[in-house]
């Protein structure tokens, strides 16, 4: 495989799509050696097919605000790969949404879903609409307008979206209600639903829970106990909340959360009512974390900075893509943490990830670490198909097993003679091989 030749071709076809190109390059570098062991992959032009989405839907979303003014946003659904199951991936409502970000997320989702052991392909979608500052009625009208187009390309056996940034339980409810009205059908076409109407237990916290199960497995490879370890978390939404909850349950101490305005350092630990307050912060819609320091006087707010300057044992970026850069990596490495794990999708820049791997630090990519969220979505799909509802204990046990299986799959390909595990390479190879074998079995389609 000539990585540079493939990347040059993609850069010509998709200029300016930095996030997408970064994600593709990382995977190609990781899988190059194993790809070259399979000449049949080259004959079938497997990589050239795998890096391009099967289908992209772009549409306008006209809606009316409370004052009667008409707005027009862009909507997208990237159906990236269906080799191992129906397209599966979230919907993101945020002003930053564009095709590059959605293609990167859909590409990553393909391999992440493959790692879960569940039959799910990869997809992603969303809009440049922002829920911030919008009334409940405005959000409802937007979701209904969005679904009038999305309904044409989704279905329980075709494409099953879920939530993501800006799309929580409320938005999923409005989307599902409109889908039901348009199709006259009740089925598992969306995940992240409420428990009363087809949702799965522990879904909101599943990404964070799964991440800590994975991190615990990583630490155990070096005979390290997570109990008593300090943890830096970025963000303060559902993912950060789930991670903080499970970290505390496992005996670790979470000392930071962050927002666009800066970060909170709480040396006493973010636990109990403090974790619950994170949800109040998110529900306020203000997207700032400073009020935490007013609510809990022992905490300190540090404006316009990131939490990676704090000396901790475990660092967990939980906010958004590329939030931890090369300079942040240098700060972390200087403080000699035990582990860094991407809980957000591609939470580290390529430079930061390379520095962690070069330092032989325990470092794992988002496609493995945060797969618990989509795994639990897959479990919701299963429950919908079977017309039943599992208990919290049953779902959590299945999630724990899936994260253990993902860890084993990552280790399988890349454990080095000195014992170091390159989780980035391992996750990419494990996901790639599953998708590649499925694509080869199904012919040139």
Language-model features: locations:
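Conserved active-site and cofactor/substrate-binding residues in soluble primary-metabolism enzymes
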Residues: 1, 15, 19-22, 26, ...
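Adenosine-phosphate binding glycine-rich loop
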Residues: 2-23, 218, 333-445
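Flexible, glycine/charged-enriched surface loops at secondary-structure junctions
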Residues: 21, 37-44, 117, 154-163, ...
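Structured beta-strand/loop patches that form or line metal/cofactor-binding pockets in enzymes
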Residues: 40-71
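Glycine/serine-rich phosphate-binding loop and adjoining beta1-alpha1 elements at the start
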Residues: 94, 113-227
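Glycine-rich phosphate/diphosphate-binding loop of Rossmann-like nucleotide-binding domains
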Residues: 191-194, 199-309
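Rossmann-like adenosine-cofactor binding region
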Residues: 262-363, 368
């Amino acid at each position: 495989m000539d990585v540079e030749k493939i990347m040059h071709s993609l850069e010509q076809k998709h200029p300016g799509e930095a996030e997408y190109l970064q994600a593709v390059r990382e995977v190609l570098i990781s899988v190059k050696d194993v790809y070259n062991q399979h000449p049949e992959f080259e004959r079938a032009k497997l990589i050239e097919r795998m890096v391009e989405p099967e289908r992209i839907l772009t549409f306008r979303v006209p809606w009316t605000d409370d004052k009667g003014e008409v707005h027009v946003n862009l909507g997208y659904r990237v159906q990236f790969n269906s080799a191992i199951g129906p397209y599966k991936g979230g919907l993101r409502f945020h002003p930053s949404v564009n095709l590059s970000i959605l293609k990167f997320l859909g590409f990553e989702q393909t391999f992440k879903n493959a790692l879960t052991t569940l039959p799910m392909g990869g997809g992603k979608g969303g809009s440049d609409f922002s829920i911030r500052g919008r009334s409940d009625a405005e959000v409802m009208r937007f979701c209904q307008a969005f679904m009038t187009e999305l309904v044409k390309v989704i279905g329980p056996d075709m494409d099953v979206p879920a939530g993501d940034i800006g799309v929580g339980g409320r938005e999923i409810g409005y989307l599902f209600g409109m889908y039901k009205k348009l199709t006259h059908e009740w089925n598992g076409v969306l995940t992240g639903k409420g428990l009363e109407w087809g949702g799965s237990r522990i879904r909101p916290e599943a990404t964070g829970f799964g991440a800590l199960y994975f991190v615990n497995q990583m630490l155990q490879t070096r005979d390290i106990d997570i109990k008593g370890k300090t943890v830096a978390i970025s963000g303060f939404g559902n993912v950060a909340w789930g991670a903080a909850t499970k970290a505390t349950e496992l005996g670790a101490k979470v000392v930071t959360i962050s927002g666009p305005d800066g970060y909170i350092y709480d040396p006493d630990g973010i636990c109990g009512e403090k974790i619950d307050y994170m949800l109040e912060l998110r529900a306020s819609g203000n997207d700032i974390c400073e009020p935490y320091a007013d609510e809990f006087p022992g905490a300190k707010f540090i404006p316009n900075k990131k939490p990676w300057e704090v000396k901790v044992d475990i660092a967990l970026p939980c906010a958004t893509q590329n939030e931890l850069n090369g300079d942040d990596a240098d700060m972390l490495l200087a403080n000699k943490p035990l582990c860094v794990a991407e809980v957000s999708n591609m939470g580290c820049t390529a430079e930061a990830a390379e520095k962690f791997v070069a330092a032989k630090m325990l470092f794992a990519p988002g496609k493995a670490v945060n797969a618990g969220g989509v795994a639990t979505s897959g479990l919701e799909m299963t429950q919908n198909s079977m017309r039943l509802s599992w208990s919290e204990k049953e779902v959590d046990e299945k999630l724990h097993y899936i994260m253990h299986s993902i860890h084993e799959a990552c280790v399988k390909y890349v454990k080095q003679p000195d014992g170091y595990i390159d989780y980035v390479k391992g996750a990419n190879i494990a996901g790639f091989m599953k998708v590649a074998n499925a694509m080869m079995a199904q012919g040139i389609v």
